[in-house]
Amino acid sequence: MSTARPRIITSKAPLLPQQTTPEQRYWRQYTSAQLVKEHNSVTHISFNPQHPHDFAVTSSTRVQIFSSRTRQVIKTFSRFKDVVYSASFRSDGKLLCAGDATGLVSVYDSYNPRTILLSINASTHPTHVTKFHTQDNKILATASDDRVTRLWDISNAYEPQLELTGATDYVRTLSFIPAAPHLVATGSYDGLIRLYDTRSSGSTPIYSLNHDQPVENVIAVSPTQIVSCGGNNFKVWDLTSNKKLYERGNFNKAVTCLDYVENFDSPMQSALIASSLDGHVKVFDPLDNFQVKFGWKFSGPVLSCAVSPSTAQGNRHLVAGLSSGLLAIRTKKKEKRSSDKENAPASFNKNAKSNNFQRMMRGSEYQGDQEHIIHNDKVRSQRRMRAFERNINQFKWSEALDNAFVPGMAKELTLTVLQELRKRGKVRVALYGRDESTLEPLLNWCLKGIEDVRSASIVADWVAVVLELYGNTLESSPVLQELMIDLKTKVRHEIHKSKEAQRIEGMLQLLTS
């Protein structure tokens, strides 16, 4: 019984193993993007610590609350007389505080923008930092351009409880140390991170850490470690030894914002998010020496970034604010949980019916579609043969070689033709009776293919036969002679690179052995 002639198998390069890491696959799930245009630069983003984790966006003279479910504005706080800064939630999510360029600090109900619960004249200078204490809900911290950080009791806010001085430039950030409610870390444009003990009556810092660049943000990642950013890097400090642990300079421009989150459904137990003026937002793993794991590129300088807190809902949103006024909201796609629906009790299933009803209605929707089974015995039309395949099947070796270099032919197909002719021992036959115009395409392809190690052996075999058959023709043709000179130069260059690679390999073996 006759069989169909087998097709020529296209030559394919070996596939590399999958290089994506579990961390990359997790952060790539933030695919659903929404862009919101604000009137001015988005300077601060804060998530509500309590469910459903709505987030406040500070821009120009207003603060907007976005719903974490719909990603739409649900509340707008616009009763500010000047540019507003750093709106943030209290730990219980019930209050929202913000400072403005006049120095006034306002405290609102988180979802009632009409009434101001408290107004504090913190300073006559712009108040850039306002933040509630993470454990004591009555304590509010503010930092203004008068280089003074103040702690207020909102139940009696006529005067500050404590004033923290010592900064010689603007204070732009502060952070409370977890598990140590009496410690406050501040960062200023004089390049120093100062640590204060609020239990002492004095207002001078316990000690200072030198960041060497104007400090934009300070955040605590553990009871003994804080991270500061400024310039094109961020630094990790150990509070027990007062020394720098790590320094990461993965950015080309100044790092503007830091955010620390814990992940319950991620390969990373925790993550440090950093944004920069170069338009990048990158993810670092604190448990892996703060190595970068993933990143996003935005259209402009990023001034603020935040990730929703990790609870039963998971880290659902990544929000970045740009200097152009663009707010980018990236949402992680939801996982399909079919097993939950299958395991749910019947009492919670609205469409569930009793067994008697199901037996009564059995077969009512059958339409006889399984009584007649039609077998399609038509022979599938095979893929159309290419020109070089037809010529090879018809033993037209020279024409098959010409078809390999037609314009638009893929490199893999050209390599397939050359390998097939070499496998069949028809290299000399395919090269007989050629002149300058028919040899030039082959030599041009060899000149490009010699750089690829996967096709170097094919190029060497074909060029050797060309030199053997057409040595005199190459000397008399200026075009072919120039191609051969270029090919010789490139071969020498590749040999030089191979020798250098072997030298480097030997050096690395000495270092690793």
From Swiss-Prot:
InterPro entries: U3_snoRNA-assocProt_15_C, WD40/YVTN_repeat-like_dom_sf, WD40_repeat_CS, WD40_repeat_dom_sf, WD40_rpt. One of its GO terms (cellular component) is rDNA heterochromatin. Keywords: Nucleus, Repeat, Ribonucleoprotein, Ribosome biogenesis, rRNA processing, Transcription, WD repeat. One of its GO terms (biological process) is positive regulation of transcription by RNA polymerase I. It is found in: Nucleus, Nucleolus. It comes from Saccharomyces cerevisiae (strain ATCC 204508 / S288c). GO terms for molecular function: U3 snoRNA binding. This is U3 small nucleolar RNA-associated protein 15. Residues 332-354 are annotated as: Disordered. PROSITE patterns: WD_REPEATS_1, WD_REPEATS_2, WD_REPEATS_REGION. The keyword Transcription applies.
